[in-house]
Curated annotation (Swiss-Prot):
It comes from the Archaea. Allows the formation of correctly charged Asn-tRNA(Asn) or Gln-tRNA(Gln) through the transamidation of misacylated Asp-tRNA(Asn) or Glu-tRNA(Gln) in organisms which lack either or both of asparaginyl-tRNA or glutaminyl-tRNA synthetases. The reaction takes place in the presence of glutamine and ATP through an activated phospho-Asp-tRNA(Asn) or phospho-Glu-tRNA(Gln). Belongs to the GatB/GatE family. GatB subfamily. This is Aspartyl/glutamyl-tRNA(Asn/Gln) amidotransferase subunit B. It catalyses: L-glutamyl-tRNA(Gln) + L-glutamine + ATP + H2O = L-glutaminyl-tRNA(Gln) + L-glutamate + ADP + phosphate + H(+); L-aspartyl-tRNA(Asn) + L-glutamine + ATP + H2O = L-asparaginyl-tRNA(Asn) + L-glutamate + ADP + phosphate + 2 H(+). Keywords: ATP-binding, Ligase, Nucleotide-binding, Protein biosynthesis. Its EC number is 6.3.5.-. GO terms for molecular function: asparaginyl-tRNA synthase (glutamine-hydrolyzing) activity; ATP binding; glutaminyl-tRNA synthase (glutamine-hydrolyzing) activity. GO terms for biological process: glutaminyl-tRNAGln biosynthesis via transamidation; translation. Gene3D superfamilies: 1.10.10.410, GatB domain, N-terminal subdomain. Heterotrimer of A, B and C subunits. The keyword DNA repair does not apply.
Amino acid sequence: MVYENPDGVMVGLEVHVQLNNLNTKMFCGCSTQYHDSEPNTHVCPVCMGLPGALPVINKRAVESAIKIGMALNCEVVEQTQFHRKNYYYPDLPKGFQTTQYDFPIVGNGKVVIEGEDGEHVVRITRAHMEEDPGKLVHIGSIDKSKGTLIDYNRSGMALIEIVSEPDMRSPKEARRYLDKLRNILDYLDVFNGDLEGSMRVDANVSVMGGQRAEVKNISSHKGAERAILYEIMRQKNLLRRGGEVVMETRHFDEARGVTISMRTKEGEHDYRYFPEPDLVPMRVSDWAPAIREELPELPDAKRARLISEYDITEMHAKALTSDIRVADFYEVVAAAVEPRVAGTWVADVLKGELNYRDLSVDSFTTDDIIQIIKLVVEDKVTEQSAVDVIRTILDDGGTPMEVVTEKGLLKVKGDVVTEAVSETIAENEAAVQDYLGGAEKSLNFLVGQVMKKTKGRADARQARELLVAALKS
């Protein structure tokens, strides 16, 4: 099926990634570990823009930017350069932002996502380095604030801005692109995505070939999807009423789910870019071969290898590789038990229980899941009981055998199951008659009653076989 886009929706994203796994900021020696600190305590003359303070480039930040570019299939330039982007805003103490203009460090890349009609390529225009401004803390909402406080702890943090072409055609595609980008960045270990402000999105949205509006500083992937959906509907409704979409910058109000006009969109000439006189151009192409050697296995390559090496399903491989920690966890488990069985238990069962509790895979040990799987494979507990063991460990702690012993979960067999089957038949005459009359679903009910009597410790397949045999005799 070919996806049709009758409204001509075009979405391009500018994603600002804070390289917070570095020890120091982009151009000074201030610590990056400011998130739990008092405001304005991780600052110095450089990141405060005091007269006479001179910047020094963080080499590790440059290496991280090149690594990100390579992972996004970008070309690394031979020589790159910093520029001053001149504008006044309270969170920018220097009166300009040190960024890159016509010599970005990488460009011309691509990311492949699942589109509306199969695989879809999102082109990467460029990715460039810049410094983060400070943080404005509004007293009240942004549009009705009684005052604004400024925290400069964030000022000068190393950022890489990843700019896409307007290749996304729906809010869902934009969300998938962001998820894929986050996945790649996690594998590169260049940032901690759990920290506030580590990944911020500006969305450029247009419909029906009209002007684009830019929605700034969206803080989450879900928020970006909602903001883009609202903006598409706003522009379509405006055009249908005979109005005109103007090029402007808008803010997304998370609480109300709406975008609000902030200002008319500036052009590049408004920023009066010029080369940063305190920083010389850098020749970075010579660094590329060594950095490429350090690139880890990326999500798409890992997914293909897991399918080939362990013979697991593509669905399981996607679930496992969506988080590098889960993928690594799985490979340890797959070395100890049958890989396809391990795939089911890690990708479906354990990951589902972790997601339900908003926990990471670090909350469970490979030794515990291996022991639980072996209990099932060795016919000592049922699958239902094994799930109960996982839930109990996550909620209350303990080891698999402690939980099995305390809750009496060892599998029951023989006479115990036969007796439960006989009691179930005797106590559920209506369901028995329905089954004998051809209602197959009544058998499922009877199996459930046997499982209930044995507290989930009987083998459901065996219970079904015994029921069928008894009812046909």
